């Protein structure tokens, strides 16, 4: 590859690496959402993003690593609207903004929705630790915000 034969500054090399990783993850999302984890191959992902298999394996050593990275990126994108719920904000505005963002993400990224749903249906083994750890804490924190709004009379109580 031409890039390896020329002298690049560290920031340019890092930018290229980041670009390639994004390219791989985008291609992997398409492949995994179409064929599932078991039905997908590293060759399919490499072909989809225009890399050779050895070049792809330079960035990710195993198919499992690619799969987990795709799921983590998906979860990070999906959880951002939840993270932005502000306890000091108006409950209806905060919840409306959250729901609108989630609907927009599902509409704009149906492959990610399909991939995540399939992972959950198959037991969530690839992301189980995340679901039990950081995600649980985030959900518990936001549930406490909603409970606080109900205690303050800003939202109706529900059973």
Spell out what each predicted region is.
Residues 69, 83-112, 152, 156-159:
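Hydrophobic alpha-helical connector segments
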Residues 23, 31-65, 69:
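Helix-turn-helix
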Residues 107-129:
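Amphipathic alpha-helical segments used for helix-helix packing
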């Amino acid at each position: 590859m031409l890039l390896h034969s020329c002298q690049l500054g560290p920031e340019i090399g890092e930018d290229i690496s980041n670009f390639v990783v994004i390219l791989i993850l985008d291609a992997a999302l398409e492949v995994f959402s179409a064929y599932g984890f078991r039905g997908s191959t590293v060759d399919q992902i490499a072909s989809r993003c225009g890399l050779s298999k050895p070049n792809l394996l330079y960035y990710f050593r195993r198919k499992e690593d690619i799969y987990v990275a795709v799921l983590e990126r998906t979860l990070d994108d999906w959880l951002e609207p939840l993270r932005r719920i502000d306890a000091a904000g108006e409950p209806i505005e905060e919840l409306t903004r959250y729901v609108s963002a989630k609907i927009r993400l599902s509409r704009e990224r149906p492959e990610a929705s399909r991939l995540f749903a399939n992972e959950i249906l198959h037991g969530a083994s690839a992301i189980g630790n995340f679901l039990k750890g950081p995600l649980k804490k985030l959900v518990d924190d936001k549930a406490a915000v909603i409970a606080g709004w109900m205690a303050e009379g800003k939202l109706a109580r529900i059973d």
